[in-house]
Design a protein with these regions (language model features):
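Membrane-helix boundary/juxtamembrane motif in polytopic membrane proteins
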Residues: 117-131
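Structural signature of transmembrane alpha-helix termini at the membrane-water interface
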Residues: 22-25, 63, 141, 170-171
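C-terminal membrane module of polytopic membrane proteins
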Residues: 131-172
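Membrane-interfacial helix-loop-helix
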Residues: 1-18, 51-112, 116-117, 121, ...
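Transmembrane helix boundary and interhelical junction motifs in multipass membrane proteins
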Residues: 17-48, 104-110, 122, 132-139
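Hydrophobic alpha-helical transmembrane segments
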Residues: 13-17, 32-36, 44-52, 94-98, ...
Length: 172
């Protein structure tokens, strides 16, 4: 995989971002892309590429839900769901941050669900960037540390455990 990625040159990071974004829209597990980004591009570039792909995919999912499904879903929902949507809209970006930091709803599903609300797009994007950044850093570090460990770097396990600790602190 690494040789193939290197053979792509400048297209490798672009391809990673596009695949991550497309995978997000199609409900592929983001953790796989996050780990791959760290393993293939290192912790810093991997984080930036992962965050770019994740936010592009999240935004695309949000927009698909908003412009292709929101009216239809709203027309079919009952009073209870309409109250939930209204409550989410009232909290706006704060709800987005909370939902991202306390992942009770899977990432890909959350993107579509939030698109059914009237939360402003800019608020959604900025809140998502802010709240997704810590986990994105952790996944890139874990991917990088895993690759280093496979390459025989004994110190990589220490870095991997540190990244897992950060991820656990974010999750709980």
């Amino acid at each position: 995989v690494e040789r193939f990625t290197n053979s792509l040159g400048i297209w490798a990071p672009i391809g990673h971002v596009v695949l991550f974004a497309l995978g997000t829209v199609l409900f592929a597990p983001g953790s796989a892309f996050g780990l791959a980004g760290g393993a293939l591009f290192g912790p810093v570039a991997g984080t930036l590429l992962n965050l770019t792909g994740a936010i592009l995919g999240a935004t695309a999912s949000f927009l698909v839900a908003r412009y292709l499904a929101a009216d239809s879903v709203r027309a079919r929902t009952g009073v209870r769901l309409e109250r939930v949507i209204s409550g989410v809209e009232a909290e706006g970006w704060r709800f987005v941050v909370l939902a991202r930091l306390v992942p009770l709803v899977p990432f890909n599903l959350l993107n579509y669900a939030l698109g059914l609300t009237r939360i402003p797009l800019l608020h959604y994007v900025l809140a998502s960037l802010f709240a997704m950044a810590p986990g994105t850093v952790a996944f890139a570090w874990i991917g990088h540390a895993g690759k280093q460990a496979l390459d025989g770097d004994a110190g990589a396990i220490r870095y991997g455990l540190l990244a897992i600790s950060v991820l656990a602190a974010i999750a709980f």
